[in-house]
Swiss-Prot record:
This is [LysW]-L-2-aminoadipate 6-phosphate reductase. Catalyzes the NADPH-dependent reduction of [LysW]-aminoadipate 6-phosphate to yield [LysW]-aminoadipate 6-semialdehyde. It holds the Pfam family Semialdhyde_dhC_1. Pathway: Amino-acid biosynthesis; L-lysine biosynthesis via AAA pathway; L-lysine from L-alpha-aminoadipate (Thermus route): step 3/5. It comes from Thermus thermophilus (strain ATCC BAA-163 / DSM 7039 / HB27). NADP(+) binds at S12, G13, Y14, A15, S36, R37, R38, L75, S180, A184, N312.
Length: 344
């Protein structure tokens, strides 16, 4: 099979660099060009030392981009939308890792991000969560990567709402997130002496990924997200507090997950009765495209605690985007992604 050429815009950041790492091992992809204004002329390993010896590519300025089969855009929010015409002319297949085209509802976008530069294009991209939108992705030329916190939340809650397991009451979500979720650009909040050893509530209300969660969950339930920053480099642990319908049992919860995720290559249900590793832990999915999902039901009250662990840069960003590309191209879904995490 002839390889498809792929270029990455914004490849010096964490999201673009992670897509590059995965793409370099993909048997059907040839990485053609990678861009960075700041590091133009520098070899890739100058910014991503883990890729030393894996590629001889050097960063180029975006103005020197040539046409390719696939263009991955890992730009700050708003940039791709403002320069859409220029970038869309370079490749028939576009994969956007920013928030620019994740939402279809212009009012939701306005509430969380402000005015959209290209509201006429909202709804033209397919949301890159294969577990939810596999059929739509099969014919998608424009793909919008999901937010990392939204990915963790959606994967944990979607089967329960689809099966009618939950009461129509507000769902409260807490997200323990890592430092890399803030991106490669340094800030006072990410400065090591300020961040190391700290567990900081940084977004108690109004988290932007709430919009994606609400728009993509069945019935558009009332969901409230609180984000807590930890000093881990990678990983997200999502816990959701909700209530099951009267008379519903643990068996019903199991059934909802098994029906939704039967045969899913990157979903693992983690709920053991004994041992140290009874529930999902971001440590064991670090660097992988797996999502570990678990739960615990308080039978006498009906309170259900749902847990999801993912790597924010892989399953939360570049990994699910590459998985979506595999679906789009008709390739085996696990290509470039089929590897386990580390232990210990």
């Amino acid at each position: 099979m002839d390889k498809k050429t792929l270029s990455i815009v914004g490849a010096s950041g964490y999201a673009g660099g992670e897509f590059l790492r995965l793409a370099l091992s993909h048997p059907y992809l040839e990485v053609k060009q990678v861009t960075s204004r700041r590091f133009a002329g520098e070899p890739v390993h100058f910014v991503h030392p883990n890729l030393r010896g894996r590629t001889n590519l050097k960063f180029i300025p975006p103005e020197k981009l040539e046409p390719a089969d696939i263009l991955v855009l890992a730009l700050p929010h708003g940039v791709f939308a403002r320069e859409f015409d220029r970038y869309s002319a370079l490749a028939p297949i576009l994969i956007d890792l920013s928030a620019d085209f994740r939402l279809k509802d212009p009012e939701l976008y306005r509430r969380y991000y402000g005015e959209h530069p290209r509201p006429d294009l909202l709804g033209c991209f397919v949301y890159a969560v294969p577990e939810l939108y596999r059929e739509a992705l099969k014919g998608a030329d424009w793909i919008a990567g999901a937010g990392c916190n939204a990915t963790a939340t959606l994967l944990g809650l979607y089967p329960l709402l689809k099966a009618g397991v939950l009461k129509p009451t507000p769902i409260f979500v807490t997200l323990l997130i890592s430092t890399s979720a803030a991106g490669a650009e340094a800030s006072p909040a990410s400065h090591h002496p300020e961040r190391a050893g700290s567990i900081r509530v940084y977004k108690p209300t109004g988290h932007r990924h709430t919009a994606e969660v609400v728009e993509n969950l069945p019935g558009r339930p009332e969901v409230h997200l609180t984000a807590i920053a930890t000093d881990r480099v990678r990983g997200i642990l999502m816990t959701a507090q909700c209530f099951v319908q009267d008379g519903w049992s643990e068996r019903d919860v199991w059934q909802a997950y098994r029906e939704a995720y039967a045969g899913e290559p990157f979903i693992r249900l983690v709920k053991q009765k004994k041992g140290v590793h009874r529930y999902p832990d971001p440590r064991f999915v670090q660097g992988t495209n797996y999502a570990d999902i678990g739960f615990e039901l308080e039978e006498d009250t009906g309170r259900l605690v749902v847990m999801t662990a993912i790597d924010n840069l892989v399953k939360g960003t570049a990994g699910h985007a590459l998985q979506a590309l595999n679906v789009r191209m008709g390739w085996p879904e696990t290509l470039g992604l089929d590897f386990p995490g580390l232990h210990p």
